[in-house]
Amino acid sequence: MTQISERLLVQAHLDAKQSNPLTPEQEADYRAAIAAELKRQNAVLVAHYYCDPVIQALAEETGGCVSDSLEMARFGKNHSAETVVVAGVRFMGETAKILTPEKRVLMPTLEATCSLDLGCPVEAFSAFCDQHPERTVVVYANTSAAVKARADWVVTSSCALEIVESLMDNGETIIWGPDQHLGRYIQKQTGADMLLWDGACIVHEEFKSRQLADMKALYPDAAILVHPESPEAVIDLADAVGSTSQLIKAAQTLPNKTFIVATDRGIFYKMQQLCPDKEFVEAPTAGNGAACRSCAHCPWMAMNTLERVLDCLRQGSNEIFVEPALIPKAIKPLNRMLDFTQAARLKVSGNA
């Protein structure tokens, strides 16, 4: 997934899959129907911050969860619902199934994937790991169940830095996959000995440092918020770097009234909800037209529509299955992450 021509083919495929816009009346009907189905089926809707605002609002209204991938995993595992509907991309649905194999996990579409997942096929990644058996394998959550099963640790962007620091303190050297930009950022912050896989997010790698500097000149009082999946030159311009949840917290706590945000624009829903008196501006990508492969919104996240949420509930379609042999292997590094972050939470709160 590194050639522009390949990106354009992917984008054309995804554009063809998008539904027509709904009228306000149609949207209200879908939301009511989905809420009724969730209640009838003892189901819960979990949505990522990058989903369209209407999906995030629906998850909140129906007692579900809107969060980053770490909290999505934790919420789905701990919730009493028999069915979890995951509005996000496929690896998120797989993670939910791995953590709670006894539950039914549905997704609005199984075609919503991730360029990081696609760019890290298990055969090639396993061969890379086999060449360095002395290294601890740490993989980003944006990977397939098979890649997770090959790993020692799974991390999200909200906990990756702390986990790598802990491993480094233990004298461990690391294989990191698949996001090269996040890996390089962690390497720079910690000084850890890391071999990096060559993957990238099609949204975040589109942010451009020169255009970002030009935009900062237009908004001199703005703070720049950057997700660490962005290129290093973009990260270097940031006032705050972090995961989606960390960027939302930065928007709440920094005194600035204007923010230039270098991550998927789906996050603006929660930022504007929590900070109604502040202004949020999209960081510039490659530009308009064919050269812009994402334009600050993941095309796969955009495939999570109201129509597809209702269809998957009514038809029981798009159920996530994970190969049974992979589950015990993949759940170990996932539980390590959850246990680590829970212990860190307790330590911060003074309970450990």
Swiss-Prot record:
Main location: cytoplasm
UniProt catalytic activity: iminosuccinate + dihydroxyacetone phosphate = quinolinate + phosphate + 2 H2O + H(+)
EC number: 2.5.1.72
Binding of [4Fe-4S] cluster, residues: 114, 201, 298
Subcellular location: Cytoplasm
Entry's Gene Ontology cellular component terms: cytosol
Gene3D superfamilies, sorted: NadA-like
InterPro entries linked: NadA (IPR003473), NadA_sf (IPR036094), Quinolinate_synth_A_type1 (IPR023513)
Cofactor: [4Fe-4S] cluster
Binding site for iminosuccinate: 48, 69, 140-142, 157, 227-229, 244
Enzyme class at the top of the EC tree: transferase
Alphabetical keyword list: 4Fe-4S, Cytoplasm, Iron, Iron-sulfur, Metal-binding, Pyridine nucleotide biosynthesis, Transferase
Pathway connected to this protein: Cofactor biosynthesis; NAD(+) biosynthesis; quinolinate from iminoaspartate: step 1/1
Entry GO MF terms: 4 iron, 4 sulfur cluster binding; metal ion binding; quinolinate synthetase A activity
CC cofactor note: Binds 1 [4Fe-4S] cluster per subunit.
GO terms for biological process, alphabetical: 'de novo' NAD biosynthetic process from L-aspartate
Pfam families hit by this protein: NadA
Function statement: Catalyzes the condensation of iminoaspartate with dihydroxyacetone phosphate to form quinolinate.
PANTHER family associated with the record: QUINOLINATE SYNTHASE, CHLOROPLASTIC (PTHR30573:SF0), QUINOLINATE SYNTHETASE A (PTHR30573)
Family: Belongs to the quinolinate synthase family. Type 1 subfamily.
Record protein name field: Quinolinate synthase
Gene: nadA
